From Swiss-Prot:
Family of this protein: Belongs to the SUA5 family. TsaC subfamily.
Enzyme class: transferase
Gene name per UniProt: tsaC
Protein name in UniProt: Threonylcarbamoyl-AMP synthase
A family per Pfam: Sua5_yciO_yrdC
Organism: Shewanella halifaxensis (strain HAW-EB4)
Lineage: Bacteria, Pseudomonadati, Pseudomonadota, Gammaproteobacteria, Alteromonadales
Amino acid sequence: MLEVLPADVAELVEQGGVIAYPTEAVYGLGCDPDNDDAIERLLEIKLRPWQKGLILVAGDYQQLLPYIDESQLSAEQLAFVHSKWPGPFTFIMPVKPGLSNLLSGSFDSIAVRVTAHEGVKALCAAINKPIVSTSANLTGQDPALSGAAVKQQFEGIIAGLVIGDLGIQASPSTIIDAKSGQVIRKG
């Protein structure tokens, strides 16, 4: 498993690699959201059913526009979303037509977040798009809180480990439905 800096990860991701990287609260596993083979590999590693869908984490809102259909949201709904970003809030938003079901699962929406974590922002800047994100843990194990824990669980399984520090969030992000405003998970 290669250890890389956030700015140097682009080649691994562009080649379809699954990587681990520090986020606000735990290490995440991620890949290119436009590469179905990479997404399938990520789902296999996690033993996660595709029907559940995945989260996209972006460095800025513009990176999310190819994936979400903001025309289905009112100006007030969008203003509320923007008031929470960047930060530890994940929003369920309508998907653009034609988006891979591997990302949206069995839903007509997708979970998205604009991060405030400098390392994740650098990673997204390096690949010039959001990254698929799910917690770095095997089924039944706690999410990895260190690079050593990532190596223990994923050595020989993933393409690389991004070097960096976890953020200061003690819990996962709050999840809110952008259309209804309903809090789905309190972070």
